[in-house]
Amino acid sequence: MPEDAIGQQVPPEQEAAGAEPTSAARERHATLSLELTEHQYRYYVLDAPTISDAEFDERLRELAALEAEFPALRTPDSPTQRVGGAFSTDFTPVAHAERMMSLDNAFTDEELDAWAERVERDAGGPVPYLCELKVDGLAINLTYERGRLVRAATRGDGRTGEDVTANVRSIRDVPAELAPSAEFPEIPGLLEVRGEIYFPIAGFADLNAGLVEQGKAPFANPRNAAAGSLRQKDPRITASRPLRLVVHGIGARQGWQPSTQSESYAALRAWGLPTSDRWRVVPDLAGVAEYIAHYATHRHDVEHEIDGVVVKVDPVSIQGRLGSTSRAPRWAIAFKYPPEEVNTRLLDIDVNVGRTGRVTPFAVLEPVRVAGSTVALATLHNAREVRRKGVLIGDTVVIRKAGDVIPEVLGPVVELRPPDARSFVMPSTCPCCGTPLAPAKEGDVDIRCPNTRSCPAQLRERVFHLAGRGAFDIEVLGYKGAAALLDAQIITDEGDLFALDAAQLTRSPFFVNKDGSLGSNAVKLLDNLTVAKERELWRVLVALSIRHVGPTAAQALARHFRSIEAIDQAGEEELSAVDGVGPTIAASVREWFAVAWHREVVRKWAEAGVRMTEEAVDEGPRPLEGMTVVVTGTLAGFSRDQAAEAIQSRGGKVTGSVSKKTAFVVVGENPGTKADKAASLKVPVLDEEGFRVLLDAGPDAAREVARVED
């Protein structure tokens, strides 16, 4: 949840200024205060919020704006002045030795710049900043006396929290005793360590699935799972959950005064406490902006949820000079990313039939704005996943949309479940053709429509697929064009596509003008089909919709066998032996060619003039033969497909993961965690210039310019 603080700091001299509040302002202030107090209680005590963090922030900012306009409305118990909340709970209250403060928030670059200007003005000049990820978890205060853990407490209202020592002791990351190190041999007699307990994203779905199986309510998101798992009356339940800790600050201490925030992190890690590997000290605000921009595009490479970046003045002496407000330090701020999670209503669950017959449920949502776009649909993967998530039709659900990733339903807000909410029932017959649905083989999670040749949904998806850039690249034949051909019954399956003529196309309104003459769409389609007949063999293989055969496997098959006939005649063992193919793809190829109507499609295309062979050409040297290369980040001179094709044409193999067997990792702008993995495994790393050396001069020359971490 939000930090319960606002990005705007009101100077003391303005506190008493302002007009007399209007009756409307007083009424709105009272309403917002009550709402926010209720939501704080649901968040901090019940671990069951009913609104998203973004909605809370929006209401809190509205309340702060009212108080800025009418200072008389601001009281000490206002939600804008509180840290967390002082609510009665089942845990014993315990006082913090030093107050756990909140953070002011910046939601825009301008707000961050304004904060930095104030800092540098009061500090007397530029200062170095420490940047770290803002973990979306549960704030915790660990108290060590003479190196031994004596107490763990939640933040509470900042002065008094809840004693959760027994539960925290069960978390594997929390050391019961701190160990001196060579660099930091003296452990303070008293040390308060501040951190965040989080639930790893990777384990969240499994936790909810287990709760649903036990008939218990699932959690809406990993943050709620962390809070709910920690605040259990039985520590054994906490111990059974994979909670993790990351520390990010210190409170009261005796006998130790670090000179910088970064030095304190080094000491905490040396004593055995888990600090983040992702914090950085930067010299100026430009460095802060780079850090924020990097994690804005790589926030999903992190093992836990984050909702922003915390920026701190690094020198402790300047922190002391800047001081604090009643709620938050002036030397730190949280830059909040636009929300990727919002709450909305699940109106229905429908199903989609894909090109391979897979039947996939998807959520029909009340449209909501998230991550820069309006979302009305979200994936649910399969019927088992719907059960695992514990969502019912009619629920308020939490959805996440990360950049270009398909929106996903995380889980339900069970507290808002209406009495008429109902379970989803997976259909037993195909919604498009009525054929009984079944798994492709025993034990499959997915169910499929076996009417592969004639099911309208599958055929439409296959035609759309074969027209894509990774296959025949037929520009006019988009989703509407594919549907138009089928709706007018111009083709019975994809085998008829390359025999199309102008007379056939006039049967569809999509391909004709108002006067009945042939439209530009039809002319372009016929021209595109003529060009597509000469596409490379590997593109033909991709266009056939053979399961598991994408561009990489298709290129390997085309390069090795040179013709569709040779691939058809090859046995499974021979196919499997091709580098880049393997047993799964080999079995899929054999299964595909064993179907009579599949072979009929190939025959029709060949008769229509589609090229079914790969001309034997002198490929030239293959200097990367047997080598595996990983590409991460954005390259200025290559698209991802172009980079892969350049590697493969020289005999190399492109993979998506880094291992000790990886020959090179090519790193562009905004690389992901693969660059870090390469460094840890000491795999040679190339920038784009080094990549060109690899392509032009070979691996030996590339090793000369590669970077290998010591």
From Swiss-Prot:
GO terms for molecular function: DNA binding; DNA ligase (NAD+) activity; metal ion binding. Transmembrane segments: none annotated. The keyword Nucleotide-binding does not apply. One of its GO terms (biological process) is DNA repair. It catalyses: NAD(+) + (deoxyribonucleotide)n-3'-hydroxyl + 5'-phospho-(deoxyribonucleotide)m = (deoxyribonucleotide)n+m + AMP + beta-nicotinamide D-nucleotide. Keywords: DNA damage, DNA repair, DNA replication, Ligase, Magnesium, Manganese, Metal-binding, NAD, Zinc. Residues 619-708 form the BRCT domain. Its cofactor is Mg(2+); Mn(2+). The keyword Coiled coil does not apply. NAD(+) binds at D53, A54, E55, F56, D57, S102, L103, E132, R155, E196, K312, K336. The active site is at K134 (n6-amp-lysine intermediate). SMART domains: BRCT (SM00292), HhH1 (SM00278), LIGANc (SM00532). Zn(2+) binds at C430, C433, C449, C455. GO terms for cellular component: cytosol. Its EC number is 6.5.1.2. Residues 1-26 are annotated as: Disordered. It comes from the Bacteria. InterPro entries: BRCT_dom, BRCT_dom_sf, DisA/LigA_HHH, DNA_ligase, DNA_ligase_AS, DNA_ligase_CS, DNAligase_adenylation, DNAligase_N. Disulfide bonds: none annotated. DNA ligase that catalyzes the formation of phosphodiester linkages between 5'-phosphoryl and 3'-hydroxyl groups in double-stranded DNA using NAD as a coenzyme and as the energy source for the reaction. It is essential for DNA replication and repair of damaged DNA. Belongs to the NAD-dependent DNA ligase family. LigA subfamily. This is DNA ligase.
